[in-house]
Structures are given as structure tokens and as C-alpha cells.
């Protein structure tokens, strides 16, 4: 089931958390909400779940208006950053909790609850640990229990709030791969919040970049990285060089060289050229530059160079096989791809 957000607004006193957000999450999609602190990503997720209420706008699950629905009526699986497991319950009881608190006709028979929990233990690869308590589990195992508990109620959508934020780097990497495989098996519409760029770009089918309560760009990870829609996206996702230039008579003049202008709608005047370090390459037709320093890092070579005659410093990232560069060495650098925005 897909989710549609229409002109969603949320205000906390004088702070605008969400400013007329429009968003469509496709059925079966894994969507990341990525942005800095205060961008509105967690507020948006909590409104989807029914844990917060919007000041205006709509939340639709499929064709059903869920804007004023209770949390229970939405049938949403929600995973908190810090797991929110019950310490006095073992793994089995934690997973079964959402099924056991149901009342009336919604309550399952005990045999069905047990079968569902055993199915989920196999799905999240925790067979044999069902009698352990949360304090006896690793961080990664606790997160799997939290996911199994969210899935137990057979939710229509799955929402995750920074699911790997409390884990160390290696466990996060392992769990990312595992969650992607789990999503492929379940096909459940899933939205997760993160401030980790690598996590969003590796896991998601599409990424929504939020900033100051608005969506700056919604696109595939490849397009987010290669074709950022705004200076903010360029600067927030990955490293970038910003080089001042001027647009005049249909040409961009940057550091004494002309660059092709792809955006015909750009007005004449001062501009900034955004170039990622890996998109600057040695090329005899490029800008003259002087190497300030170089450093080998595994399979990559990082340089800092000063463009001439402008004096602008740029970071360059090359394959280690590109050779060695010494401070003071003269090079020429060309931009393979770049973005141009008004200064």
C-alpha cells in the first residue's frame, strides 16, 4: 500500500517543522527521509504513524484518509531508534506483545500468536534466542527483535526512526544489508529516517532530502548524488567544491576558463560552480593549478590544489593508480560534471 502526503503543515510554537509538504511513497518502496537535525524528517514520520498530528494537510494510506486515525487503526509497524523493548519480557514475549494486547474479535488465538512469533524469529534469524531478555542481546540483535515486533501485527506500512543510530559502524553496515534483503522478501512499503548519507544512498529505492520543513529533492540515490537539484543538496550529500564564476553572454567564466552552460534559464550575473572532488580530473585542456598537498588513502589519492589565477582551493580525489603528485607541482584540472547555481 502506498502513502500520500498532501500539503502537510506542522508548527511547534514559532518553529515551522513542516511547511506544506507533498510526498508520495509508492507501494512496496523503501524510501529514506534524509536531512539535518531540525529538517522535519522525524516529525513527518511520526505524523505518518499517528504519534503526532498535523496542523493542516492530509495523510492517505492508499485511498483511505488516515489524517485523524488513531495509531491502532492505521496498522503501522514502528521501530524506534533505541528499540523500546520491554526489559522484563523475553524475546518471544516482546515480539508477541502487539498481538496479545488486542481485544475482542481482533485478538488471535494463542496457537496462532505462537506460530506468528516463530515465523518472525526465523525471518529475523533469531531462532534459539526467544527466551533471552534484552539485556542478554547485542545491539544488532535487539534491533532485529524490534523489527520482528513491528512486523508481528502484519502492518500495512513499516516506519523506522533512525533504526541504526545507536549501533557501531560495523554492525550498522551489516544490518543495512540485512534490512535491504528483508525488504526484498516482505515487499512492505517502508519509510525510514536517517541523517546518515551513506545509509540512505545504500538502502533506499528513493531518497527525500528535507531542509527547513521542505523537500529539496526526491529522487533515486544515483540522481541525488550525481544531479543535485539545489546548492543545499550538493553540500549536504557528499563532498563538494564551490568555485565562483560569472555568467555573461551565454558563457560561464570560471577561473579564467569558459564552461558549457546546461541551464539556459539561469540569469546573467555571479554564479557558483559545484564540483565533486572525484569529478575533477587531470586534463591538459583544464584549469591550471598548483598542488598544495597530496595523501594516499587506500585505493584513493586525495589532493588539494590552488586554481590559477583565481587562487581558489579545490579538493581532488583520484584513483591511486593516477600516479604521485608533489606539493608545488603544476597540473591542469577539468570538471567532468558540475552544477551551476546563482551566487
UniProtKB/Swiss-Prot annotation:
Keyword tags: ATP-binding, Cell inner membrane, Cell membrane, Membrane, Nucleotide-binding, Sulfate transport, Translocase, Transport
Keyword Cell membrane carried by entry: yes
Highest taxon listed in the record's lineage: Bacteria
EC number: 7.3.2.3
GO molecular function, one term: ATP binding
Top EC group: translocase
The keyword Cell inner membrane appears for this protein: yes
Domain ABC transporter: 3-237
Listed Gene3D superfamilies: P-loop containing nucleotide triphosphate hydrolases
Protein localization: Cell inner membrane
Membrane topology: Peripheral membrane protein
Disulfide bonding pattern of the chain: none
Entry similarity comment: Belongs to the ABC transporter superfamily. Sulfate/tungstate importer (TC 3.A.1.6) family.
Function: Part of the ABC transporter complex CysAWTP involved in sulfate/thiosulfate import. Responsible for energy coupling to the transport system.
Quaternary structure and interacting proteins, as annotated: The complex is composed of two ATP-binding proteins (CysA), two transmembrane proteins (CysT and CysW) and a solute-binding protein (CysP).
Protein name as catalogued: Sulfate/thiosulfate import ATP-binding protein CysA
Organism: Xanthomonas axonopodis pv. citri (strain 306)
Amino acid at each position: 500500500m502506498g502513502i500520500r502526503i498532501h500539503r502537510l503543515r506542522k508548527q511547534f510554537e514559532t518553529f515551522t517543522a513542516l511547511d506544506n509538504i507533498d510526498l508520495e511513497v509508492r507501494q512496496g518502496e523503501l524510501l529514506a527521509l534524509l536531512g539535518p537535525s531540525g529538517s522535519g524528517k522525524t516529525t513527518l514520520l511520526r505524523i505518518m504513524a499517528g504519534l503526532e498530528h498535523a496542523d493542516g494537510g492530509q495523510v492517505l494510506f492508499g485511498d483511505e484518509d488516515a489524517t485523524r486515525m488513531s495509531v491502532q487503526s492505521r496498522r503501522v509497524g514502528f521501530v524506534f531508534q533505541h528499540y523500546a523493548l520491554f526489559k522484563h519480557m523475553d524475546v518471544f514475549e516482546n515480539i508477541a506483545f502487539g498481538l496479545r494486547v488486542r481485544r475482542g474479535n481482533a485478538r488471535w488465538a494463542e496457537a496462532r500468536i505462537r506460530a506468528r512469533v516463530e515465523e518472525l524469529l526465523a525471518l529475523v534469524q533469531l531462532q534459539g534466542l526467544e527466551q533471552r531478555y534484552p539485556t542478554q542481546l547485542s545491539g544488532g540483535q535487539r534491533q532485529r527483535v524490534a523489527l520482528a515486533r513491528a512486523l508481528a501485527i502484519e502492518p500495512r506500512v513499516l516506519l523506522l526512526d533512525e533504526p541504526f543510530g545507536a549501533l557501531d559502524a560495523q554492525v550498522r553496515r551489516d544490518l543495512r544489508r540485512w534490512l535491504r534483503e528483508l525488504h526484498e522478501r516482505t515487499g512492505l512499503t517502508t519509510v525510514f529516517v536517517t541523517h546518515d548519507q551513506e545509509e540512505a544512498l545504500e538502502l533506499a529505492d528513493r531518497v527525500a532530502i528535507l531542509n527547513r520543513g521542505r523537500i529539496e529533492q526526491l529522487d533515486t540515490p544515483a540522481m541525488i548524488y550525481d544531479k543535485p537539484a539545489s546548492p543545499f543538496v550538493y553540500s549536504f550529500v557528499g563532498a563538494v567544491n564551490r568555485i565562483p564564476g560569472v555568467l555573461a553572454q551565454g558563457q560561464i567564466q570560471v577561473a579564467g576558463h569558459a564552461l558549457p552552460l546546461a541551464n539556459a534559464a539561469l540569469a546573467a550575473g555571479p554564479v557558483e560552480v559545484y564540483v565533486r572532488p572525484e569529478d575533477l580530473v587531470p586534463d591538459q585542456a583544464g584549469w591550471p593549478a598548483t598542488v598544495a598537498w597530496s595523501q594516499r588513502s587506500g585505493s584513493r589519492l586525495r589532493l588539494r590544489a590552488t586554481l590559477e589565477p583565481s587562487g581558489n582551493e579545490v579538493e581532488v580525489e583520484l584513483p591511486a593508480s593516477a600516479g604521485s603528485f608533489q606539493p608545488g607541482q603544476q597540473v591542469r584540472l577539468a570538471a567532468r560534471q558540475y552544477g551551476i547555481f546563482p551566487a
